[in-house]
Amino acid sequence: IGLESTILDMTVSPPMILRPGAITADMLEEVIGVVSVDETILGSESSQAPKAPGMKYRHYAPKAKLTIVEGSLKEEVFAIRQLAYEKSRQGVQVGIIGTNETVEFYTHGLVKNIGSRENEKTIARNLYRVLREFDDEKVDIIYSESFAMQGIGSAIMNRLEKAAGHLRISASAVVKQQRYRRVIFVSNTDSYIGPMAAELLRNKELEQ
């Protein structure tokens, strides 16, 4: 499927997944019962060294800095759009890893369609190819959407995490930092404008 195979440690009880791949935890449990997962592949850095080969260091990492943007899909798209816009204005060559469902919403940067979220095998198969293409096109920074930590998605996120050196940012944090320079009030009468403005200022949603 484009990613390395699943590695399962059968010397412990319950058996432990050391590297996620096309054979998912659900598939294994249907055959051998309960399996555990090595904590070093659960999406965060650990003080313990990974047991599986090729899992300790940035694996198949692109030359450009790769950042995973995490949140709801809507938040991720909004955040990546904003980040790409800001970096592009600074003359930075931006790469974006998007999907069938989102690529049309990105207006700045070099956008790569990694596949449909409804077909995770396609995403897994395209991941390393897309990273290599960004190398060939000499982008400076890459922003990637995140994927569900279920099924093959866990393997996709594991490889993305390794390639990014565990660099992740919150999409909602980027959205909150968005500055609004103009607010248009629409009202049938002037009596509503004052309370509307006061409520906005009370909530401190605007950065002056």
Predicted segments, located by residue:
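Active-site-adjacent structural elements in enzyme catalytic cores
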Residues: 1-182
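Conserved active-site segments centered on acidic
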Residues: 177-208
